């Protein structure tokens, strides 16, 4: 998400864009499934719920909570330090126990308030990373992605 919101921030660009000098890594659209939209809020949730499978990787990836806040797409929106708001589709299982659903709800509300276009599709009874398995929900997710691409490419 940070690469979408802050495509030219050197902290989130590892590889240079090849081609013409005036090319950028700005994205024309984003499709994301069960994203980490607020790393710090997710970490606090995981600590409160004692979910070690989320706590340990967060602490390994981020040096401290300040870095979690800095690396949070939600907080980037709140701070206003984003560069662009590409059209976005979020696929989210409503039984994802990695986050409370208030996190994507808040992100969508803020994204729209800032002028961005975002659609969120909830999948009843589906857990985190649900679309990695074949089934009706995955079929629905693929259909939504196709529709989104047809409208945005």
Question: What are the roles of these predicted feature ranges?
Answer:
Residues 1-153:
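Alpha/beta-hydrolase superfamily serine-hydrolase fold, recognizing
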């Amino acid at each position: 998400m940070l690469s979408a919101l802050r495509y030219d921030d050197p902290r989130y660009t590892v590889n240079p864009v090849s081609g013409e000098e005036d090319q950028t890594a700005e994205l024309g659209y984003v499709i994301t499934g069960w994203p980490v939209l607020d790393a710090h809020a997710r970490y606090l949730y995981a600590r409160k719920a004692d979910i070690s499978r989320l706590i340990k990787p967060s602490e390994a990836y981020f040096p401290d909570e300040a870095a979690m806040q800095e690396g949070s797409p939600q907080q980037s929106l709140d701070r206003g330090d984003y560069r662009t708001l590409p059209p976005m589709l979020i696929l989210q299982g409503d039984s994802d126990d990695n986050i409370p659903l208030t996190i994507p709800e808040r992100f969508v509300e803020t994204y729209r308030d800032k002028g961005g276009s975002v659609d969120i599709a909830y999948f009843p009874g589906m857990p985190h990373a649900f679309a990695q398995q074949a089934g009706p929900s995955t079929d629905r997710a693929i259909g939504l992605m196709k529709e989104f691409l047809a409208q945005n490419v």
